[in-house]
From Swiss-Prot:
One of its GO terms (molecular function) is GTPase inhibitor activity. It comes from Saccharomyces cerevisiae (strain ATCC 204508 / S288c). Probable component of the GPI-GlcNAc transferase (GPI-GnT) complex in the endoplasmic reticulum, a complex that catalyzes transfer of GlcNAc from UDP-GlcNAc to an acceptor phosphatidylinositol, the first step in the production of GPI-anchors for cell surface proteins. Ras may inhibit the enzyme activity of the GPI-GnT complex via the association between ERI1 and RAS2. It is found in: Endoplasmic reticulum membrane. Keywords: Endoplasmic reticulum, GPI-anchor biosynthesis, Membrane, Transmembrane, Transmembrane helix. The keyword Membrane applies. Its main location: endoplasmic reticulum. Component of the phosphatidylinositol N-acetylglucosaminyltransferase (GPI-GlcNAc transferase) complex composed of at least GPI1, GPI2, GPI3, GPI15, GPI19 and ERI1. Interacts with GPI2. Interacts with GTP-bound RAS2 in an effector loop-dependent manner. The gene is ERI1. Pathway: Glycolipid biosynthesis; glycosylphosphatidylinositol-anchor biosynthesis. GO terms for cellular component: endoplasmic reticulum; endoplasmic reticulum membrane; glycosylphosphatidylinositol-N-acetylglucosaminyltransferase (GPI-GnT) complex. This is Phosphatidylinositol N-acetylglucosaminyltransferase ERI1 subunit. It is a multi-pass membrane protein. The chain crosses the membrane at residues 8-28, 34-54.
Length: 68
């Protein structure tokens, strides 16, 4: 697999993690329990950190890839 294709694969995975997290937070918004607050407090920073880390690694892969 070419590095550029690997970069697109990692980028797609990154955005899918972000979209699944946002959809989960949206679903929990209408929940009456206090689970919503714990999920936002604990998972939102971890999700954003993971998204930034994978996006940075992906940008490094794109920067070092060569068109063949």
């Amino acid at each position: 697999m070419r590095p550029r294709d690997q970069g697109f694969l990692v980028l797609g995975f990154t955005y899918s993690v972000l979209l699944i997290s946002l959809a989960t937070f949206y679903w929990l918004r209408n929940n009456d329990s206090f689970l919503h607050y714990w999920c936002v407090l604990l998972l939102c920073p971890a999700t954003l950190w993971l998204w930034a880390l994978i996006a940075w690694c992906d940008s490094e892969m794109f920067a070092s890839s060569k068109d063949e």
